[in-house]
UniProtKB/Swiss-Prot annotation:
One of its GO terms (cellular component) is cytoplasm. The gene is trpB. HAMAP family: Trp_synth_beta. It comes from the Bacteria. InterPro entries: Trp_synth_b_CS, Trp_synth_beta, Trp_synth_beta/beta-like, TrpB-like_PALP, TrpB-like_PALP_sf. It comes from Lactococcus lactis subsp. cremoris (strain MG1363). Belongs to the TrpB family. The modification N6-(pyridoxal phosphate)lysine is found at K91. This is Tryptophan synthase beta chain.
Length: 401
C-alpha cells in the first residue's frame, strides 16, 4: 500500500493535528493554502531548485566511509554529506524553502526558534539573501553553549532574543517564538525548524528536507545497484531523519533507525529519549510523543547536543514508531563523544554532536548486520560549532591523548 500521510486534517494516524489558539488558526490555514499553491507553481519550484543547486551546493555527495566501515567491522557505511551544505548542516534545505514561501505570501519579516543555532543561522542566512527582517528566539542556556552561532546570526543581520523562561532551552524558545508570531501574524512568517508544530509545518519541513533521501536513494542505486538495508539518522525534533526516511517509506526492505539522545542514560532524568520514555501529549500545537510526568507536565530534556534536547518528536515519527515502520534507539553523551572522535580519526570528518549520535549507533548496527549488508547514515551537520565544547569536556575528563 502506498504511504499517504498526513490526512487532510493534518493527522498521521492519531498524531499531528492543529492544536493552536484561534488567533493563530487563520495564519496556519493561510500557510496551508500558500504551501499547496507553491507545490503547483513552476516558477516557485524552479527558483527553489536553482537556489538549492547554486547557493546551497546540492547535490551533496553520498560518501563510502571505507575506514569507518573497517573500524566497525561489518556493514558498508555510506554517509549522506549534509555537513557540506552552505551553513554546514541540513537546516538550510528547509529554511530556504520556507523563507521563499514567506516572500511569495507577501510577508517581510521572519522569526524562528533555534537550539544548537544551526536553524537560526540558516534562517538568518535565507533572510539576508531575500532582504527580510529576521528575529531568532534562543534559550539562554543555548546562547551560552553556542555563542559562536549567536555571533553568526547577528553578523547576518538577525536579532537574537535570549529566552529566560522555563529551562531556557529549545522548547522555551519555541514557546517564545509562537507567542511572538501571534502578536505579528499579519506581516511575519514563523520558520519552524523541525517536523514539529501544528499542521502544515511537519509536512512542509518534511517535504523540504526530503531532498536528502531523494538524492541518497538515487546515488545509492547508482553506486550499489540496489537499495540499502538500513538508514540511520539522529532525531531531536526529527527533520534530518524524516528527510532521509520519507523517500524510502514504501521500500519495505529498507529498515529505518532514528537515534535519540540518551544523555546521561535513559534510567536517569537527564535524557531526551522521547519515543523510549515519552507518551502521547500535546505540545507546540501538535499531538506527538512527549516527555512528561504523571500530571502531564512537560519534563526537561537533556543532551550534550543542543540540537537534540527537545522533549517532543515530530508526529510523523510517533506514527512511524506506532506502526513499526521505523525503530527508535538511543545513544548516550559518552557514546556520542566516542562517535565524534571515531569519525574524526577514521575519515578526517569532524561531525556535529547531533550527527555523532547517528555515527555511534551506526558502528554498533554495522557489527550486528554483518559485512553483506549496507547502510546510509545522515551526516546532518559539521562539528565546527561543537569543537570548543568537546575540547572543554575532554580536557575536564583529561582524555585528550
Amino acid at each position: 500500500m502506498t504511504y499517504n500521510q498526513p490526512n487532510n486534517q493534518g493527522f498521521y494516524g492519531q498524531f499531528g493535528g492543529q492544536f493552536v489558539p484561534e488567533t493563530l488558526m487563520t495564519a496556519v490555514k493561510e500557510l496551508e493554502v500558500a504551501y499547496e499553491d507553491s507545490k503547483k507553481d513552476p516558477v516557485f519550484q524552479a527558483e527553489l531548485k536553482e537556489l538549492l543547486k547554486d547557493y546551497v551546493g546540492r547535490e551533496n555527495p553520498l560518501y563510502f566511509a571505507k575506514r569507518l566501515t573497517e573500524y566497525a567491522g561489518g556493514a558498508k557505511i555510506y554517509l549522506k554529506r549534509e555537513d557540506l551544505n552552505h551553513t554546514g548542516a541540513h537546516k538550510i534545505n528547509n529554511a530556504l524553502g520556507q523563507v521563499l514561501l514567506a516572500k511569495k505570501m507577501g510577508k517581510n519579516k521572519v522569526i524562528a526558534e533555534t537550539g544548537a543555532g544551526q536553524h537560526g543561522v540558516a534562517t538568518a542566512t535565507a533572510a539576508a539573501l531575500f532582504g527580510m527582517e529576521c528575529t531568532i528566539y534562543m534559550g539562554e542556556e543555548d546562547v551560552k553553549r553556542q555563542s559562536l552561532n549567536v555571533f553568526r546570526m547577528e553578523l547576518l543581520g538577525a536579532k537574537v532574543h535570549s529566552v529566560t523562561d522555563g529551562s531556557r532551552v529549545l522548547k522555551d524558545a519555541v514557546n517564545a517564538a509562537l507567542r511572538a508570531w501571534v502578536a505579528q501574524v499579519e506581516d511575519t512568517h514563523y520558520v519552524m525548524g523541525s517536523v514539529l508544530g501544528p499542521h502544515p509545518f511537519p509536512q512542509i519541513v518534511r517535504d523540504y528536507q526530503a531532498i536528502i533521501g531523494q538524492e541518497a536513494r538515487a546515488q545509492f542505486l547508482e553506486k550499489e545497484n540496489k537499495l540499502p538495508d538500513a538508514l540511520v539518522a539522529c532525531v531531536g525534533g526529527g527533520s534530518n531523519s524524516m528527510g532521509l526516511f520519507y523517500p524510502f517509506v514504501n521500500d519495505e526492505s529498507v529498515e529505518m533507525y532514528g537515534v535519540e539522545a540518551a544523555g546521561l542514560g535513559i534510567d536517569t532524568p537527564h535524557h531526551a529519549a522521547t519515543i523510549t520514555k515519552g507518551r502521547p501529549g500535546v505540545l507546540h500545537g501538535t499531538l506527538m510523543d512527549v516527555l512528561q510526568d504523571e500530571n502531564g507536565q512537560i519534563l526537561e530534556a537533556f543532551s550534550i547536543s543542543a540540537g537534540l534536547d527537545y522533549p517532543g518528536i515530530g508526529p510523523e515519527h510517533s506514527y512511524f514508531n506506532a506502526v513499526g515502520r521505523a525503530k527508535y534507539v538511543d545513544i548516550t553523551d559518552e557514546e556520542a563523544l566516542e562517535g565524534f572522535k571515531i569519525l574524526s580519526r577514521t575519515e578526517g570528518i569532524i561531525p556535529a554532536l547531533e550527527s555523532s549520535h547517528a555515527i555511534a549507533y551506526a558502528v554498533k548496527l554495522a557489527k550486528e548486520l554483518g559485512s553483506e549488508k549496507t547502510m546510509i547514515v545522515c551526516l546532518s551537520g559539521r562539528g565546527d560549532k561543537d569543537v570548543v565544547q568537546v575540547k572543554e569536556r575532554l580536557e575536564a575528563e583529561k582524555e585528550v591523548k
